[in-house]
Amino acid sequence: MTLAFQLAVFALIATSSILLISVPVVFASPDGWSSNKNVIFSGTSLWIGLVFLVGILNSLIS
């Protein structure tokens, strides 16, 4: 169970880092938002899901 928690935390940190870099780049590009809207929404949905997963796993571990 601890390994699953550690992997979920790592995935959350990796997703946060990717979104931290990619979202401003998409907004700064001339046609970025209209062409990459689905990718940003998918990444944000993944991030929200990982936040809940880490919270659930944390409550099971401690």
From Swiss-Prot:
Q: Does the keyword Nucleus apply?
A: no
Question: Primary place of residence?
Answer: plastid
Instruction: Classify the source by domain of life.
Output: Eukaryota
Its record classes its membrane topology as: Multi-pass membrane protein
Which interval of the chain is the signal sequence? none
Subcellular location(s): the record lists:
Plastid, Chloroplast thylakoid membrane
One Pfam match, given by its short name, reads: Ycf9
Annotated transmembrane regions: 8-28, 41-61
Cite the entry's keywords alphabetically: Chloroplast, Membrane, Photosynthesis, Photosystem II, Plastid, Reaction center, Thylakoid, Transmembrane, Transmembrane helix
Annotated GO CC locations:
chloroplast thylakoid membrane; photosystem II reaction center
For this chain, the family text in UniProt reads: Belongs to the PsbZ family.
> What is annotated about its quaternary structure and interactions?
PSII is composed of 1 copy each of membrane proteins PsbA, PsbB, PsbC, PsbD, PsbE, PsbF, PsbH, PsbI, PsbJ, PsbK, PsbL, PsbM, PsbT, PsbY, PsbZ, Psb30/Ycf12, at least 3 peripheral proteins of the oxygen-evolving complex and a large number of cofactors. It forms dimeric complexes.
Identification of the protein by name: Photosystem II reaction center protein Z
Q: From what organism does this protein derive?
A: Coffea arabica (Arabian coffee)
